[in-house]
Design a protein with these regions (language model features):
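Metal-cofactor-dependent catalytic cores
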Residues: 1-168
Length: 168
């Protein structure tokens, strides 16, 4: 079974060309994952790991030295030198009318080791993040004031009353 071949056809999720909830796929998932392993449908709106928003900066991505897609950011902020983002936890980012709280640095997991094009794993990537960045790269964030963000919007780092409730 090619686990990476997951797509939708007419609204149905397929695994290797078969319906995700078919007995054949269930048997293969259990064979790969062990007794009791199964796929489940999740219709929830939230699809995130730690917090709803993962922000990276171009400076940190350049320091990382690999394809930025390995970090899985929702938002990349340009014009940031080096690892300046490491000083941002506890503050907020104002992007147009949007206000984003910066909670903390993201502790990276094994997903960074997978090439986004080939899905080939290179554990040296994740090991390098732990060695060079204490395992943390990019920012766990959440939206305080919603709205639309567009490419080219100015980003301002904000502290104080506007960021009440953001842990330092």
């Amino acid at each position: 079974m090619e686990v990476t071949e997951i797509w939708r056809s007419e609204g149905e999720v397929l695994v290797a060309g078969r319906p995700w909830d078919s007995p054949e796929v269930a048997a293969e998932v259990e064979a790969l994952g062990g007794p009791g392993a199964r796929l489940v449908r999740d219709e929830g709106a939230e699809r995130f790991d730690v917090l709803p928003l993962l922000v990276a900066t171009d400076g940190a991505i350049a320091s990382f030295g690999h394809d930025s897609r390995r970090l899985w950011p929702n938002l990349v902020i340009g014009g940031v030198e080096g690892m300046a983002e490491r000083e941002w936890p506890g503050s907020c980012l104002r992007i147009g009318k949007v206000l984003i709280g910066v909670q903390d640095l993201r502790l990276r997991c094994i997903m960074t080791s997978y090439d986004p094009d080939t899905q080939v794993q290179d554990s040296a990537i994740t090991q390098g993040i732990y060695r060079r960045f204490e395992g943390k790269l990019a920012l766990n964030c959440f939206v305080l004031e919603g709205g639309e963000i567009a490419v080219g919007d100015e980003v301002q780092r904000v502290r104080g009353r506007a960021c009440a409730g953001v842990a330092e």
